[in-house]
């Protein structure tokens, strides 16, 4: 096995380092797995991940969000709770975020190179301004508003 030293491998190493420095385990683990895949016989599975990775990730994320409801740790609200203006605002924000995520998927599919900038910006935000990584889909959705892309 020979290691491939190219710009993609270098970018993945930089993302691993930035992930470690900013305590962003999602970026660290993702970049490390992709680097491992790129440098080994697992490279043949990269096109599969490229084609289905976002869908699989959204499925896993949705399972993670719904699990507390299924386990009983979070109770479904009574109907009266939906009359509260804060609940309606929460529903509206949820709709907005889902819409932005949809725009983000479209933008990332059309211009995947922008994902690197979004990841670096997210990592810098976590490392230096106390931010929390909310995910590249929402960031890409917000970026699509500035770029005028849908």
Swiss-Prot record:
InterPro entries: UPF0756_TM (IPR007382). The chain crosses the membrane at residues 12-34, 52-72, 79-99, 123-143. It is a multi-pass membrane protein. Keywords: Cell membrane, Membrane, Transmembrane, Transmembrane helix. One of its GO terms (cellular component) is plasma membrane. Pfam families: DUF441 (PF04284). It is found in: Cell membrane. Its main location: membrane. Belongs to the UPF0756 family. PANTHER family: UPF0756 MEMBRANE PROTEIN YEAL. This is UPF0756 membrane protein PM0771. The lineage of its organism: Bacteria, Pseudomonadati, Pseudomonadota, Gammaproteobacteria, Pasteurellales.
